């Protein structure tokens, strides 16, 4: 995947360079981006992948911070922390029917990831716009414990990938919009598969204990840019 992203980035940069031929510097739609670091505050919405019981964290408002450092060429190293104000359904698998439903509870979901990000126009903007893509890894964590529900979110490993647009008007500030997908594994506790009530199990027959889910995020951010 990284090789593919790199090839796409090189192709776009080459096309961008060719498109500047025939333009005087002051008339070119391309402008050098002379900053090498950025610190971004962002907010948006997290769309969590659902599960059949609804006990895993749901989507909700999202906010966080991102730091990027120029590595060379079109490449940046990006570190990000995101927080989601989420909620989930809680159940008591030792009870049956309505008595098993503990209601919807507020929970906090946190995402930490480290990415390789590529500016598709290199260290230049096109009409003040810089398209970007990113690919990385991280972990997720959640304060999801609700007694007597045995479900635990844990700290699953996560893949992250996405893209976005930077608006760079000049100076030390920019705006950006980003879409990102977080792919991580969820697991149900063994208690969901025990027929302790004599009326069946909490998890439906044939439901896998562990499964992967894609979780999308759309955010808008404001950045402070730094010179090297």
Which residues are covered by each model-predicted region?
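Outer-membrane beta-barrel proteins
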Residues: 29, 51-55, 67, 100-104, ...
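Sec-dependent signal peptide recognition
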Residues: 2-7
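Predominantly the C-terminal beta-signal and adjacent terminal strand-loop region
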Residues: 170-228
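Hydrophobic h-region of N-terminal signal peptides that target proteins for export
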Residues: 10-18
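Gram-negative (and chloroplast) outer-membrane scaffold detector with strong preference
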Residues: 68-149, 154-157, 169, 218-219, ...
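Short glycine/proline- and aromatic-enriched beta-strand/turn motifs that initiate or cap beta-hairpins
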Residues: 19-70, 142-144, 218-228
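Solvent-exposed loop segments that connect transmembrane elements
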Residues: 21-23, 31, 90-102, 186-209
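Transmembrane beta-barrel strands of outer-membrane/channel proteins
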Residues: 39-45, 79-83, 133-139, 165, ...
